[in-house]
């Protein structure tokens, strides 16, 4: 006789292994563990996408703060960089703003020349 799928014991073991470290029944009772694991996997999937958005927002906030400290707005700065043909992504602009303020000031001057 052919058996379809894997044994239920193996599947339950896998779910309980994923639920290891959870508090209370969620780590010991299969039904509760299954619900907790499914919920955790949903959050994991959602948050992998949210992380990208949150980091982009953080980079933009840092660039904006550095721009305003040098007397320019973020939107004018980005527009000036585009017109100047400087192709730097927001992550690297953020790093430059934090680690090398003098170089960032030069970028602002270049952007200022192309905006006005």
Swiss-Prot record:
Cross-referenced InterPro entries: Ribosomal_bL20, RIBOSOMAL_L20_CS, Ribosomal_protein_bL20_C
CDD domains: Ribosomal_L20
Organism name: Hydrogenobaculum sp. (strain Y04AAS1)
TM helices/strands, residue ranges: none
Origin: domain of life: Bacteria
Record key words, sorted: Ribonucleoprotein, Ribosomal protein, RNA-binding, rRNA-binding
Name listed for the protein in its UniProt record: Large ribosomal subunit protein bL20
Family as reported in the entry's similarity comment: Belongs to the bacterial ribosomal protein bL20 family.
Sections of the chain in a coiled coil: none
Role played: Binds directly to 23S ribosomal RNA and is necessary for the in vitro assembly process of the 50S ribosomal subunit. It is not involved in the protein synthesizing functions of that subunit.
GO CC annotations, alphabetized: ribonucleoprotein complex; ribosome
Keyword Chloroplast in annotation: no
A GO BP annotation: ribosomal large subunit assembly
A molecular-function term among this protein's GO annotations: structural constituent of ribosome
Protein's UniProt keywords contain Ribosomal protein: yes
């Amino acid at each position: 006789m052919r058996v379809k799928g894997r044994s239920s014991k193996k599947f339950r073991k896998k779910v309980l292994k994923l639920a290891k470290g959870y508090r209370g029944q969620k780590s010991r009772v299969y039904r509760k563990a299954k619900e907790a694991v499914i919920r955790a996997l949903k959050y994991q999937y959602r948050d992998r996408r949210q992380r990208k958005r949150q980091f982009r927002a953080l980079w933009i906030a840092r660039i904006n703060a550095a721009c305003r400290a040098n007397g320019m707005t973020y939107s004018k700065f980005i527009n000036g960089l585009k017109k100047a043909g400087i192709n730097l992504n927001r992550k690297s602009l953020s790093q430059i703003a934090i680690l090398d303020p003098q170089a960032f000031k030069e970028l602002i001057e270049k952007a200022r020349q192309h905006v006005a």
